[in-house]
Amino acid sequence: NITVGGTGKTPTVIAIANALKAYGYTPGIISRGYRGDGQEQEVLANSVPSQVGDEPILISKKTLSPVWVGPSRIKAAQHLLTKHPNVNVLISDDGLQHYALKRDIEVIVIDGSRKFGNGLPLPSGPLRESKKRIHECDFAVINGSEKLDLSIPTINMTLVGEIFHNLSNPGHTCNVNELWGRDVA
């Protein structure tokens, strides 16, 4: 994405990986591992968030695909492919600004509500780079109901939370319908 903050990249990566699996591909996912310790390593379902970041663990659990983190996406990809030679497609989570990484398809995820904020680059605004970068991408995923007039094909998505997890009792979950009309705090 070209803006800072949550745009829906992680759910998009999960959806793309699972769609590729449904079509017979074997995806692997590489990520920087934001808020991890910066070491290049494989992410497993039982990995520690302080080492690999929380989003790569979620991706690993939701896709059951190999996931590797590290500051260099190229090295992460090399390690992943060495350990998992059956992987035939790589997905880079948050790799749009990682120009050293060759790519065949570029997807940009845009928050349909916030769009591009005030249109200014960091530190004055939310843009990591110019909006002109959009035109270099193959298509955009717009998170939210807002339609954007872009010069590239777009796909709209809306994230809907269906399950709540009790943080005090991790084994306890409930459906959003179970909470309808009840006070929650």
List where the protein language model places each region.
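Walker A (P-loop) phosphate-binding motif
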Residues: N1-A45
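Short intrinsically disordered, low-complexity coil segments enriched in acidic
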Residues: N1-T12, I16, D149-I155, E162-F164, ...
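Short, flexible coil/turn micro-motifs enriched in small/turn-prone residues
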Residues: N1-T3, V48, L90, V176
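Residue-identity detector for threonine
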Residues: T3, T7-T12, T26, T63, ...
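Conserved beta-strand elements of the Class I
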Residues: T26-I30, I108, A185
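Phosphate/Mg2+-binding loops and adjacent switch elements
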Residues: G33-N156, I163-N169
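A short helix/loop element that forms part of the nucleotide-sugar donor recognition site in Leloir-type
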Residues: N169-N175
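P-loop NTP-binding site
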Residues: E178-A185
